[in-house]
Amino acid sequence: MALPVALYVDNEKERYYVVDSTGNKLLSFAGDGKFLQEFTAEGSLQKPYDMARLADGSLLVVEKGRNSLTRVDLKNKKATPLVLKQQGREVFVDRLEVAGGKVYVLDRLSGRILQLDEALQVVKSFTMPADAGWLADFKVVEKKIWALDQKKKQVYSYDENGRPSPPIQLTGVDFPVSLAVDQAGLFYILDRHRGAVVVFGRNGEFKYQFLTKGQGRDNLYFPQEVRFDHLGRLCVVDEGNSRVMVFKR
């Protein structure tokens, strides 16, 4: 793979999908890291950035090259791009999550997280605080949305009805780009510039950090995303080193 930018874990099939933006392709791997196959939509993908699998088996792919949320029918090898709109305004999709049968996207222009229906139409909007900075990532864990503010270095959370909780301030990170939340409620923050994973408690208290910037076995070089798989392992998309690293406790 050239430059991996995102990882999707298919818990049901126990497969790992890596989004290669520069190579304009999706790569699938088994749980042991064995390469399975690649998908390019017959060369039509344009700068894919994120992806997820729907209940019907089709894939949703964020294509930044055409600003679309593209539905991919693997069986019929058909890709259908869709430019999302909310109240007549074009949505610039960044990150994508599917949880509990619901589709969520991050609109990088408005800074909102949007919930979509089966027809990929906006049905709910989660608005960040008025003084929010720049949202870099979000995850949906147990019906709760967790969003990472890169500029203010804060974590926002919302329940499924959109009710917010007080923001959680993070200290000791330089350039947070992604977050993951474990079953104990700890935050795993990926610092792109430092090449490190920094762990915080539920209230934002610093716990520890691991990995450093570099191109060796125990290094990260401009990493892009972090998430937990169905086995509780922490997966880190290490863009600069063209790999995905998997850690277990």
Residue locations for each model-derived region?
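Eukaryotic scaffold repeat domains enriched in small/polar residues
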Residues: M1-R249
